[in-house]
Design a protein with these regions (language model features):
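Gly/Pro/Ser/Thr-rich low-complexity, intrinsically disordered segments predominantly at protein N-termini
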Residues: 1-228
Length: 228
């Protein structure tokens, strides 16, 4: 009897190819939503968005496209507990936007708390990169927690740090109360990290195990067998 082959961990370069990445991008958003939903206090919702409208300081509407977002809605208090351990970040880098804090006008039913974005090739090249950078800077100034998941080795990264450049895969969490982003770096063949998804204080972060999410996608899509 042959020995069972251990599954490959971490991101696979094949998944960056145009043949595979669009499906990966869509499916990971869904997997992340399904993971986070039952772990949220009941007064939060998470949805996959095609666009996002916010009011800037002049009252004009800005339209952006995060991948997933978490909103808070009013409801009675709910208990929350989670025993999954979040890994410490690899290091921290300064936020290049240096956001200035100001009051934002928000609808009571649309209090944006967190965005989670899996970067696509369009986020890392040309005008797409510039638009992504400006969008993230605007959201940071609006007091939104930003989670960025970069599973692409090609293209520009908005975090200007040599350690970021040396990593093949990078996940960052920029909290609304900080100008320093926590960074989780991974190389080819390394498991993706478990990261915190921040909520509004005093609510606890939701641990997000990216390696588990990726492996679930590979198993459900049948790609786990093809990539071994």
């Amino acid at each position: 009897m042959g020995t069972q082959k251990e599954p490959q961990v971490g991101m696979h370069p094949t998944l960056e190819q145009p043949r595979y990445f669009p499906d990966l991008h869509i499916s990971l958003n869904v997997e992340i939503r399904y993971w986070i939903t039952p772990r949220l206090p009941e007064y939060y919702t998470i949805s996959v968005e095609r666009g996002l409208s916010m009011l800037d300081r002049t009252g004009a509407k800005k339209h952006y496209r995060p991948d997933a977002r978490i909103d808070r809605v009013e409801s009675p208090d709910a208990s929350y507990a989670n025993t999954i351990v979040v890994q410490p970040p690899s290091f921290a880098v300064g936020n290049p936007s240096q956001p200035q804090r100001y009051l934002a006008i928000r609808d009571q039913d649309d209090n944006l708390i967190t965005t989670i974005e899996i970067l696509s090739p369009a986020n890392k090249t040309g005008y797409g990169y510039e638009n992504f950078r400006l969008k993230q800077e605007h959201l940071a100034r609006q007091g939104v927690h930003l989670v960025e998941i970069d599973l692409l080795t090609q293209g520009k990264r908005r975090w200007q740090d040599e350690r970021v450049d040396q990593a093949q895969y990078v996940t960052t969490v920029l909290r609304a109360t900080s100008e320093i982003a926590n960074v989780w770096a991974a190389q080819l063949g390394e498991a993706l990290p478990t990261i915190p998804v921040p909520l509004r204080q005093p609510d606890a972060d939701v641990p997000l195990p990216l390696e588990h999410i990726l492996q679930e996608y590979l198993k459900k899509s049948g790609l786990a067998r093809q990539l071994d």
